[in-house]
């Protein structure tokens, strides 16, 4: 009876150690995919960050890195 109990405990430990990496691995993979999809290239971000460089089409000044919008982002007013 003791051998059966020990065998069951060993089996339970082995199964639990196998289940942990598999369950966490799926979530980590999904998180990595979401992170990579959200990343922007330097060209998408603009030269100065998350704004549009000059000569990009705009509707509001906040879209432009220079905060100057006249249908297109401008370097100065």
Curated annotation (Swiss-Prot):
Disulfide bonds join 51-65, 58-69, 64-73. One of its GO terms (cellular component) is extracellular region. InterPro entries: Conotoxin. Pfam families: Conotoxin (PF02950). It is found in: Secreted. The keyword Signal applies. It comes from the Eukaryota. Keywords: Disulfide bond, Knottin, Neurotoxin, Secreted, Signal, Toxin. Residues 20-45 form a propeptide. One of its GO terms (molecular function) is toxin activity. Expressed by the venom duct. Residues 1-19 form the signal peptide. Its main location: secreted. Belongs to the conotoxin O2 superfamily. The presence of a 'disulfide through disulfide knot' structurally defines this protein as a knottin. This is Conotoxin PnMEKL-04. It comes from Conus pennaceus (Feathered cone). The lineage of its organism: Eukaryota, Metazoa, Spiralia, Lophotrochozoa, Mollusca.
């Amino acid at each position: 009876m003791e051998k059966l109990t020990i065998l069951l405990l060993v089996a339970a430990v082995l199964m639990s150690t196998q289940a942990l990496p598999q369950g966490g691995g799926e979530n980590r993979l999904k998180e990595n995919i979401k992170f990579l999809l959200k990343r922007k290239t330097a060209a998408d971000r603009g030269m100065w960050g998350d704004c549009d460089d000059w000569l990009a089409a705009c509707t509001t000044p906040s879209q432009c890195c220079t905060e100057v919008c006249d249908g297109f982002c401008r370097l100065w007013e």
